[in-house]
Amino acid sequence: MASSSSMDIEGATQHLRDILKLDRPGNSAEASLVESQRKPSFNGELNGVLGSDLMGAAMVEPTVHNSDKLNGQDTQTICLSGDDGSICVPIRANIVEIVSSRDSSIDSKARGSNKVKIQPVAKYDWEHKYYYGNLIAVSNTYLAYAIRGANNHSMIRVLHLSSTERSLLKGFTGAVTDLAFAHLDSTLLGCVDEAGNMFIWQLTSHSSKIQDEVIVHIRRPEDTPLNSNRRLIWCPFIPEDNDESPEDACQTLALLHEDRAEVWDLDILRSNNSSWPVDATELKEGFITIRGHAARISEGALSPDGTVLATASHDGYVKFWQIYIEGQDQPRCLHEWQPHNGQPLSCLLFCDNHKKQDPDVPFWRFLITGADQNQELKMWCTVSWTCLQTIRFSPDPFNCGVLPSLKASLDLSAEFLILSDVQRKVLYVMELLQDQEKGRASFTAVSEFLLTHPVLSFGVQDVSRARLRHTEVLPPEEESESMTAEGNQGTSESRSGIQIKLYCVHTKSLQDVQIWFQPNQGDSSSLFMPQSGSQDGFSFSDPLADLNVEAMSSDKESGDSGSQNDLSKILPLPSPADFMSPAPSALPKLMTPDAFMTPSASMPASPGSSASSLTIVTAMSSSDSGARGGDDLTQSPKMSVECVNSSFANAGSPRSNSILISGLGENIQVSPPNPPLSLDLQAIDPMVVPQASPTRARSPDVISSASTAMSQDIPEIASETLQRGLSGANADSGPILHSDSMASAASILHLLSPRARSSAEHSLLPLELGAASVDGEQRLSNTPSLLETALSQENAGAAGGSCSDSSVNHAWPAAPDITRETRNSLRDNGLGDCSREEIKDRHISSPYHRRTYHLTQNDSQDASAEQSDHDDEVASLASSSGNCGPRSSHRLPVKDWKTSPRSSPKLKRKSKKDEGESSQSRQIESQMSTEVQDELLQMLRSQQREIAELRQNQLDLLQRVTSHMDAVQSSMMAHIEHAMLAQQEQEQRRMERILVEGQSRNQQLQDQLVQQLVQTLNNSLCNRLEKVLREEMKKTVPQTISKSLEPVTGQMNSTIAAKLTAVEGALKENVTKVVKSKNTTDAIGRAAAEAMQGPIQAAYKETFQSIVLPVFERGCQSMFQQINDSFKQGTNEYIQQLETHIKNRKQRDQDTRDPVIGQLQQMIDSLQSSQDQLASTVTASVSSDVQHQLHMIVGNLQDSILTQVQRIVKGEVSLAMKEQQAAVTSSIMQAMRSAAGTPVPSAHLDYQAQQASILQLLQQGQLNEAFQQALSAADLNLVLYVCETIDSQQVFGQQPCPLHQAVLLSLIQQLSTNLSTRTELKISYLEDAVMNLDHGDPVTRDHMSAVLTQVRQKLFLFLQQDAHSPMSKRARRLMMMLQGLVNH
């Protein structure tokens, strides 16, 4: 208790808060778990996999190698925390939900990740929304991003990454919806705007300036609606060694519109057009349009050869289209399916490695699809069309209303998927692992990197392996070595990591972002996770599987149940579907991309060749799969071995014993899906002969023979004529050995040949060797050599001729081909029917034998005729089936095979020596002539020479095989030792890491317990200590203080009394002196004045405001009231006096005015009478003068006036008649055309009266009546008068239009009758009148077509007569407008 009371409470409290990190969010998964168990008020957040309690988190090791845990886990939930604990979180399940961290929300104050390095490039404000296209395009040389100018016009800014030079691209309609470079090394920049206009620029740098050249510009019609969802997709660039210009390969791209997709060939466009822009409506070739989706097309992808387009739409479908740009064929839908059960799709990514393209790896093997703005991602296998993995993103519990809006992008190596959330300031990096051989791909880890702002769009420039400290980019060869070293050493000794370089568009700026982190170092167990519906016997691979030395490792160290050494006990798993084997009928029908090309005379390059091709994803129909099951599985020896080896490799456990040396493996019978076929397989070590995947291993025979059936709906690969099979009698018997030294020698010679060794890198070896049924160790030590076996069996004779026939009853064995020289020699010597039975018997005990196959009854060609060309170059040591088989003059039946005609003539003669050489010699001498004997001697000599050559070849071959086997064994032992040492070191490091992690977890647990103990003690002691201190202080402190202060108080009182007495006397004396002093008096007076000045002023002010002002205000108010009353009274009195005065004044004026008026009236009368008299006098005199002058003038001008008047009257009358005739005709036509809508007045007014009436109506605002009256008069001048009087904007600027539809139609018709005069006024009114026509009005619908057609004809005549008029442009535009309305 004493120690607790002596604690510094405030310091302990702050220390405890610092330990528990109560002032900031926790960043430890274990602390979060402990705090969530103890108190929910702590701020720690859960990181990693949910569902484990406190003790589980402390005691269970979170290793990714625990296959038992993985085997039972189908779903997984990952809660990200926003700190370094959210980097490389392992993914272990097929269905994974990733929950965003709280710190990633926009309103969070958390800082960005320290793994992210940001450098600003440009400052610009982009609108915060989800952009379906790209705002930025990145290449190794240039950077382009879309912006808006001051007048809201879209532009593209181009930056040179090395020289920081800038350029601006303009000329867009609406906003830029998508832009992209053809590839990273390309200078071709493609762009599409909201109107669908396509731009392709060629960017070059000259004298530190960026030069942009438009090489393609496709322009859409002006009435094209704007759409912000248009996309631009380039055809992927596949670099080739012989490519001189990479830009020539990138000449195909796709445009995605709302309702269609277009594929454009830039070569055809550039060859057919030399000037740009070009209207899309004028193009007839160079592109193809694809329609077929019910909703908006959101994503697309072109195959590398440009023959297949994959589209994803909001209707939920992904469709594959076969396209023919140059031909007349329409695009064909090859396959369609809904990957997300009808949800709108937003992502379509094919996992192809374009950074390091392997010609043996097929394209489009795996596919990533996304729905609902990539809230859900799925990994698909395009061979079996099965979903391999599902990833779902969900918001954190504090922001459930803000759903993720993700944009996804794969790097060129297809190893990392990068995602940005528009609604959160975060970047996700997901690691992707692919296994082409096993047909599996999955995401293995996810990393979260916090940013300062949300990313609206980004472009990945490079993903490479870099040094940890110096961020030095490793070269490709060191990168692969580093990857291997990291896989063996683990995360604790990793020296390198992944560096991602990308450019991000934020809401406030464009930034250069670099991310460095160490990838997931766990095993690849997530790649082999069981799917729903998989077989029960499926087991996960051990971590030793990656070393390829499982045959030499101990099975006792693993925790797997069951023996994995016995290959016959391994449950067979279904191999991935391929066109080499029939697929189930339930799979959708889809042709291979190779089959989409036009059939040619030769087969295209297969995936096993040097050329790259697409993954074969075609499924066969149910009828063909059943009917052709046996044929497809028994096409050729090479094909059959590939198929069975592929399925066997997928089914077998990686810990099974691998045979180190070819030819020494066990004979294992594996039943394919279609019985009764079985094969004797031998396991080949992957380190000696690399295994090929089912999709890429193709024998040359299949490639050379399958060239004619690729254009069918169900592609059928042509096979060799060789068929394989075994009879049902020996289906359950042990492996049957057919030793053939010649076949074995030829096979081994083929293995050792340079062509065979080089071709082994890309496909399975055509070598097919049997194996003896002995143990591996006995095989290595007790196997006789080839020559020893041959020599020991040489004298066996015909006694062993029935060994093979006793247990085997099948067709003639297919022997390897021999050289042309040996074949010709044997043919010339007539040994086409020689027997090989004795040679077989002579090598019956050899472990090297050739696997046998059936020749069907319909075979009529040589089994070796379809061998590839490199087989003919091998100098075989055995007879070919072409000399002894169907090419012979006869074919032996099966029952005669016991005495095989293929045996050597020399062996026949040796077998007949015992029957008596003397009788045979005598018979020969008696029956044959000397000439026949010479021929036989020559034949014997030639055969002896051949046998000697064969023996010498066998000796050479034995030496080569022995040296090769020694080298192989030494290399195998070195590999095994190295692998075992590496595995031992890895296990040791793993144990050390486990111990360190256990100690760290224990230490963390102890720290947590100490923290909680301190907190508990603090909480309990603080309350109790405070209560105790208060009670003790209340009881003891006041009493103690009073007791100690009593004597002090008495002493102080006496001392103070004495002091006060002395001070009082001195004070009185001094005060008296001071008061009597003049200075003091003055000072006091000044001080009093200064002191009293302020209070007096305030008192006066307050008194004035509170007393004087109210009294004065009341006095003024009463005074003003009295003044007002007096003024009113005086005013009334004045008014009365004024009225009386005015009345008196008026009366006096009236009295004086009457006599004056009478006098004026008299004067006016007199003046009028005098004026009348004067007027009559003047008129008479003037009229007489005027008449006299007129008579004189008329006499002189009468003739000239008559002549002029006649001419003028005649011209005016004729012109008036013509105008009247035209007006009458026009009125009649107008009355006939607009009889239904145009009223005709009963009586015509004259022109002036009509003008006055119309003007009056216009002044009154009755526009419709004014125009109707003018149009009813059938006078164009009157109509023009109305148009001139009132402006067109005053008429048509009102809404709705004051003119009726009938008046509008009549106005359009009359104004268009003559466009040669007053053209500007007429066209102006015509434009406005046409724009105000109501298409829904029945009168307009009935008469609009005829009226507008007439107007178009008048406009056409006007343009023909005066094409260069200033009004021709407006007239042409009006005619285009009328054309659209007429067609509408």
UniProtKB/Swiss-Prot annotation:
Bias (Polar residues) ranges: 482-494, 854-866, 918-931
Coiled-coil ranges from the UniProt annotation: 930-1012
Region of interest (Disordered), ranges: 471-494, 551-584, 796-931
Start-end of each WD repeat: 171-211, 227-274, 292-331, 340-390
Alphabetized SMART domains for the sequence: WD40
Subcellular location field: Cytoplasm, P-body; Nucleus
GO cellular component, one term: P-body
SUPFAM superfamilies noted in UniProt: WD40 repeat-like (SSF50978)
InterPro entries xref list: EDC4-like, EDC4_C, EDC4_C_sf, EDC4_WD40, WD40/YVTN_repeat-like_dom_sf, WD40_repeat_dom_sf, WD40_rpt
Basic and acidic residues: bias regions: 834-844
Major location category of this protein: cytoplasm
One GO term (biological process): deadenylation-independent decapping of nuclear-transcribed mRNA
Keywords, ordered alphabetically: Coiled coil, Cytoplasm, Nucleus, Repeat, WD repeat
Chain's role: In the process of mRNA degradation, seems to play a role in mRNA decapping.
Family: Belongs to the WD repeat EDC4 family.
PANTHER family cross-referenced by the UniProt entry: ENHANCER OF MRNA-DECAPPING PROTEIN 4 (PTHR15598:SF5)
Protein name: Enhancer of mRNA-decapping protein 4
Gene field: edc4
